[in-house]
Each structure stands twice: as structure tokens, then as C-alpha cells.
Amino acid sequence: MLKLVIGNKNYSSWSMRPWVLLTQAGIPFEEIQIWLGEPDTAAQIARHSPTGVVPVLIDTVNGAELRIWDSLAICEYVAEKFPGKALWPADVAARAQARAVSAEMHSGFSALRSNMPMNIRNRYPGKGMAEGVAADIARVATIWRECVERSGGPFLFGEFSVADAMFTPVVFRLHTYGVVLDGAAAAYAQRMLDAPALVRLAQLAQAEGHPQARYDSKYA
């Protein structure tokens, strides 16, 4: 069985992407959770991760252990390992676009990330709108609208895919900070929040405890 090493569900945006993909796709995995911000966190992560960060996916291939780090690389591996789950679009052009927006999410939107830290269980309406954040949000909304309109929905490329998993943290961030969207972008964000994997993640984030002052106190 696959093993997925993650951090706190409430705060670790990188961890939640492969967690949501596996959960939404119904792919069984063993979860290894390491609490962030604790005295032994670095040592615990080092037992599993060659880079010292989470997430890490652990698999056994031909009798040898395989470790994959980086959320997008993990999602790519899962999509290839389980082709029947159709985690990328079947159409070549749509698949290229899905990879493009996933990569853009992976490397971009720094203003939004910095000023709207991941925090599923708290609410900070109106906070975080620093320079550059509005432009990031506008770009996200454009991606969502164009992808859903092109594919016909309900998700970015029809059925739930790697691209949706990659945008999961932004969906939660916009909800936490009370960002109002409209039209197809708003409808997509709500469909994501209603997806079983995101509902379950939000429930677990609410219940897990282990608060992190560096996140919780930013807009307290």
C-alpha cells in the first residue's frame, strides 16, 4: 500500500494536494502525519524525506522502496500508477492545459500564499489583501472560469483531476479570508468545498488540534 507522509491538515497546503487527490479518487493509502512546529519535527520528517520537507509518497516497486517528494511529482506518479482513475484528461490538448495550470499553481501566486496563510479552521474576512493579492485572485478566477467553461465542468477539466487537487489550497484560502467570487469561478469553488475529499479534510483539520501560533496569530 502507498504511504503518504504529511504535516498538519489545517496548515500544510503542500501536503493536502496529494492527500485530496488520493482520497477523492478512492485510492487506499497509509497516512503518516508529522506535527509541524514541534521540537522533533525536523528529525521526524528526516526519517522519511530526503529534502526535509513534506509531503513524501512511499511506494514499493520491484521489491525496493521508492520515495517521491514534491506534491506535483507525487500527483503525477499517482496518475500514472492508477491510469484507470483518469486523473489527467484523456484529450491531449486538455491534458496539456491541465498540466500548464497545475504548474502555474505550483510555482506562482506568491502574494496570495504569503498574505493569506493556509488555515482551514479559522476565518479572517477582509484580511490579507496586500499588494499583488488581488491580481493573484483575479488570475485564479480566470483560470477556473475558462477551464470550467471549456470543459463543461463540473470540475476544471470535467471530472476531478490533478489540476483540481493542485488548486485545493486556494479554494480553502479564499473561503478562510472571505473572498467573494462570482459566476463560474464562485460555482466551481463551492463545488470543490462540497467534494467529499475536501469535506473530510475540513472535518479532520477542525478536529486535529496542534495549533501553530505563527499562522493563527497573523490576523488574530
Give residue ranges: language-model regions.
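GST-like domain detector, emphasizing the conserved glutathione-binding G-site
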Residues: 1-129, 219
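A generic structural-conservation signal
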Residues: 31, 183, 201-202
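Conserved beta-strand edge residues that scaffold enzyme active sites
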Residues: 35-37, 188, 206
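Short Asp/Glu-rich motifs
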Residues: 40-42, 193, 211-212
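Active-site-flanking alpha-helical
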Residues: 79, 170-171, 202
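GST-like fold's C-terminal all-alpha helical module
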Residues: 105, 109-194
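Acidic/histidine-enriched, glycine/proline-rich intrinsically disordered or flexible terminal extensions
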Residues: 205-220
